[in-house]
From Swiss-Prot:
Protein name, as recorded: Probable tRNA-dihydrouridine synthase 1
Organism: Bacillus subtilis (strain 168)
Record lineage: Bacteria, Bacillati, Bacillota, Bacilli, Bacillales
Enzyme Commission numbers on file: 1.3.1.-
Gene this protein is translated from: dus1
Molecular function in Gene Ontology: flavin adenine dinucleotide binding; tRNA binding; tRNA dihydrouridine synthase activity
Positions contributing to FMN binding: P17, M18, A19, Q71, K141, N202, G203, D204, G226, R227
Enzyme class: oxidoreductase
Amino acid sequence: MFKIGDIQLKNRVVLAPMAGVCNSAFRLTVKEFGAGLVCAEMVSDKAILYNNARTMGMLYIDEREKPLSLQIFGGKKETLVEAAKFVDQNTTADIIDINMGCPVPKITKCDAGAKWLLDPDKIYEMVSAVVDAVNKPVTVKMRMGWDEDHIFAVKNAQAVERAGGKAVALHGRTRVQMYEGTANWDIIKEVKQSVSIPVIGNGDVKTPQDAKRMLDETGVDGVMIGRAALGNPWMIYRTVQYLETGKLKEEPQVREKMAVCKLHLDRLIDLKGENVAVREMRKHAAWYLKGVKGNANVRNEINHCETREEFVQLLDAFTVEVEAKELQNAKVG
């Protein structure tokens, strides 16, 4: 367990902020599987200040999710500070996180996201201004560098600490790598040794064993899990249990997976309405179905679903089909 500012986390497992994924429906589901902290998807500072309707919806927080970190991004100090003040005063988020890791060109060309990684002095200036303007603890999520020739992870993390930031989450890849190659955990270890604020490691934590290895090898305070949790909140539960007991829980059976998928769908419908939710849930269903044998047909059919009823019927029929095959195989065996 560790604290970010005055916010106590019940364990060391953190859900990463993933754009287009980490809305309240997904976060709450992951929270119920034991995450110590969940992070909301990044929100544009300018969109907050323009009072954009879609963006205001992205700021919605279910109190059952807490503690929660709400992430903002931007390239100008003035707008970032004003957006942070809005989040501070108008949401129940526990932590305000600043994105310095997003590698996507449309973000970096606005001098936001990973573009900050090139200038530790700018990081200090921006973080300091936000810290001075808000009451909630401020954290930063960053990558280790822009490219192999511009890795300032230690200086950047130290700048965050000097500016009053309460924690750093570090992804061990450069901006140029995007999500390719392997994460450099040695850099994460260096950063942990260079600052006294909590450091959360991120990158290539695909199994509970990976999480323990990251903690052991780098000394970080927490592990951040992103893509491995897509359609798989059991990854969070199994990691928490493994870190606490040393025992590995079994993977879920298809009926349990489809039940949670349906719960996720219903929460998304409550959040966004049936039309939007069903379409958005198609990608999530593909993730929930990953690893289940014979899922090709149902995935294809789900991609044409327009209603909750269709969606649920397909998942239920697939569950019965898989269980029948498993029973048949057990008899043969």
